[in-house]
């Protein structure tokens, strides 16, 4: 991708600035996935295919909370990538494809170092595949594929741009990216479940005092008015132990479990209130858009 910025300072002196990124052809009718940060703020986006053809791309929608964007081009005879049917596992060989530093399409090889990485502070929702395949500026938004060329993830970030973080790169899982793709095509935005609470993790001594095995448990600190949690009868001070039978160990996991729900889905909450176990049934709402 090339994204162009038209900046005027002073008004009579216009300068055009461009940057590069990569993307993945997801459908045969021209829908493309890339990173939100690759196209954020762009006045025009041009996509170049491997065969050398170029086309202006239309931005269909973005999801800043997970750093994905959907583009659309109008070209014939385009081949979408195939999705991997295997769950990503530590030790799997993967290939990162992109356009590092604008030098042209390149492939780097690595292995999956970890899965379900979260708590990195990169995105609101994190469930990264960690790999040691070389990722550089220009690779963002490109595919991470298995040895058969099937999509495993969307390359998104490196931990740091210093030599101390070499070999630590992150990709958004293909299953997550495909869900966002479908949401944006249908709704123009990502659709996620929402309860409407703020919570903090129980300290180990507090968890033990309540008979929980640390780090299990989140204590509710605030409930949004007229939210699903409000209507379900949750109260500040309630300790959420499980959500739909998933043990709650931290805010990141709880957010991911709720966000993966569709609005209208039932939510079974196992909570502690005043030292007594209680089951509360709620109905997931729609997560508000973050500006």
Model-derived features with residue positions:
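Conserved catalytic motifs of ABC-family nucleotide-binding domains
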Residues: 237
